Each structure stands twice: as structure tokens, then as C-alpha cells.
Amino acid sequence: MSKTNVVIEQTEKFGAHNYHPLPIVISKAEGVWVHDPEGNKYLDMLSAYSALNQGHRHPRIIQALKDQADKVTLTSRAFYNDQLGEFYEKLSAVTGKEMILPMNTGAEAVETALKAVRRWAYDVKKVPENQAEIIVCEGNFHGRTVTVTSFSSAEEYRRGFGPFTPGFKIIPYGDIEALKQAITPNTAAFMLEPIQGEAGIIIPQEGFLKQAQEVCKANNVLLVSDEIQTGFGRTGKMFASDWENVVPDMYIMGKALGGGVFPISAVAADKEILSVFEPGSHGSTFGGNPLGCAVAVAAMDVLADEGLVQRSLEMGAYFMEKLKEINNPIIKEIRGRGLFIGLELTTAARPYCEKLKELGLLCKETHETTIRFAPPLVISKEDLDWAIDRIKQVLHVTE
């Protein structure tokens, strides 16, 4: 039995079956390329759901990890550590926000944001206790915790996990009139993904984010942008909200903030919002740990120094252009910004992902019928052309 089959069998035997991965084992990775135990080489076009914007094992990020691991890895927040302040200052500069609150995973950052906007509603907006409402969108994906699952509109994420947390309203994504109608004096925030990733790379109609910002401002409602998957250059801008020159009241960040090396997430907002927390009101033993902070600083430096945001914009435009050349009636729509692209089919997408895997290209279906392409932003034009050739080979139909 091959090493790959041994690992898959072992994983399936002892692990809970909460994922349905493609049948490949990755044992080595560098840049945009990964290898299986048998030495076969694959181009990664998923980037761990956009956590690998800087590529696998970027040498500067790995060096930052090694250097910090030789000094101190964890202090808890019972003490200061010498990496946290620099991380705060750099992320504050990137977001333009006055305060940062660090966590580890994206879902933790979302939970942090929910707690922050609720307490802001009570302490600042003076909403009656336990009456705060938060508006979210259909098709949302903000994580897997019970509270976040409570406002999911996907039955597969909710089945068997009730009772659910109250206090949320769901409106159609991109519907400004629905947002206006959903707001009441008790509304604390409107939280959304500026581009919905898990829903299939869904982009709201142009102007929606700007209109939403204006509606929120007029009603003293916080606009919260979940940039966990879209942030740090993925869409060809630092944040997807930048496409409409919208600066939300709060950013939620994760994934690529850790450079594909270490889990670190954060919420960024101004003091009026994050000052609602006092010692003991929220925390995380590992949040803001020196190892994660050192890695995140290096990850942000790599994005800036290597011009990866602009690279995403340029390579993404080229990629979209080439995908639109594919002649096949099963292609329903191609959507995307930067290197965040969804190719929606009229049939199941997984068989095509499996065919691409056999040709050495790794991608994954989302919402059954959409193939998500999100390669590391460091991808070269040569490697992108290599990928395009294989995508055309699998999807192209000659007349």
C-alpha cells in the first residue's frame, strides 16, 4: 500500500469525518508547489482558503518563526511580551484603526467582534440590556462556533446544533432596501463579507458597500467587515472593502495574517469601540503570543515589500481573461477580483476538481457547483499559464 493510502486510511479511521478532502496527502510544500509522499508535484490553487497568500513556507516568515522560537514562544497575557506592541502598531497602520485585539482563529475574531459591538450598543448607544440586534447576510460564512452557526442560512451548518443564540437578523446579500428595513433603534451592527467566499465568490452589486456604510452611519449602526478570507491582498486590494473606498468601523482579520505558518487573528477598530473591553471581559491564553506576533509582522512585511497586493490585481485580471476564453456551455458564470475567483458550473464541480488533481492542480469546490481558484499571491505568470493550460484541458469543449 502506498504511503498516501496508508495516511488516508489512518486519518479516516481515527479522525472525525467533518471534512471531505480530495484524496491527496501533502507532505512537503514551498511557494506555490506541494508534493505528496510519492514525490508527485502539484500546484496549489486553494492556498488553504487564502491563508497562504505569501506562499508556502516563505523564507522570511519561516526565519521570523525560527528566530522567535529560539527566544520566547508564549507568555500569556498575564505579562507583556516584546513582540505584541510592534504587531499592534503595524496592524494599526495597515487598517488605519486605533486599537487592535488579537486572537488566534478567524471564528474567535468573529466572536470577539460580536461581543464588542453588543457591549458598544449597551454602553455607548444605550440600547436596552439584552435587546441588541446584529444584521447579517444570507449565504454568510463567519465560522463554525454555536453563535456564528446561529445566524448561518445553510442548513448543513445548523442541523443538530440548536438551541441557537438569539439577536440576529438575516437579509439578502447586497439588498440595500432590506438593510434599511431591518434596522431598528436596537441595531448594533451590520456584519458582512465584502465578497462572500464560501458562498461561491459572490460579489455584491457595485455601490452596495458604500450605500451600506451611509445607511449605517445615518442610523448609528456599526459596519463590520469580515476580511478573514478577502484581506491582505487576496482580491487585488489590501482589503476587499477598498474596492469601494469603504473603511468599515471594524475589521475582522485572520488567515493570511499568519502567513500560512501560525494561526493569528485580530479585530481592529477605533478606541470608541474597543475601549468597551476592560480587564477580565475578554481574552485568550494564546492571543497575541510572541510567536504569532513575530510571524504576523513578517507576513505583513512580505506583502508590502514584494508588492503582492498589486501582483494579485494584475495576475487576477490576466487569469480571469484566460478563463473567459474557455468554451463550454456548462460554465454558468466566472466571478472574481484579484486572485479570488469562482467558476460556477451548471453541474457538480467536484468531479472537475478531481480531474484537475490528476493533472497536478489542486483546487476545491464550494457550494457544490463552483470551483474556487485562489492561488498564493506569489504565483508567477509561468506557473499561472501552466495552471490555465490544465484548466482548459479539463473544461474546454471544441465546437
UniProtKB/Swiss-Prot annotation:
GO CC terms, sorted: cytoplasm
Cited Pfam families: Aminotran_3
Pathway membership: Amino-acid biosynthesis; L-proline biosynthesis; L-glutamate 5-semialdehyde from L-ornithine: step 1/1
EC number: 2.6.1.13
Chief location bin: cytoplasm
Any one GO biological process: L-proline biosynthetic process
Cofactor(s) needed by this chain: pyridoxal 5'-phosphate
PROSITE patterns per record: AA_TRANSFER_CLASS_3
Class of this enzyme: transferase
Catalysed conversion reaction: a 2-oxocarboxylate + L-ornithine = L-glutamate 5-semialdehyde + an L-alpha-amino acid
Compartments where found: Cytoplasm
Keyword terms of this UniProt record: Amino-acid biosynthesis, Aminotransferase, Cytoplasm, Proline biosynthesis, Pyridoxal phosphate, Transferase
GO molecular function terms listed in the Swiss-Prot or TrEMBL record: identical protein binding; ornithine aminotransferase activity; pyridoxal phosphate binding
N6-(pyridoxal phosphate)lysine PTM positions: K255
Cited CDD domains: OAT_like
NCBIfam families recorded: Orn_aminotrans, PRK04073.1
Function: Catalyzes the interconversion of ornithine to glutamate semialdehyde.
Membership in a protein family: Belongs to the class-III pyridoxal-phosphate-dependent aminotransferase family. OAT subfamily.
Protein name: Ornithine aminotransferase
Organism: Brevibacillus brevis (strain 47 / JCM 6285 / NBRC 100599)
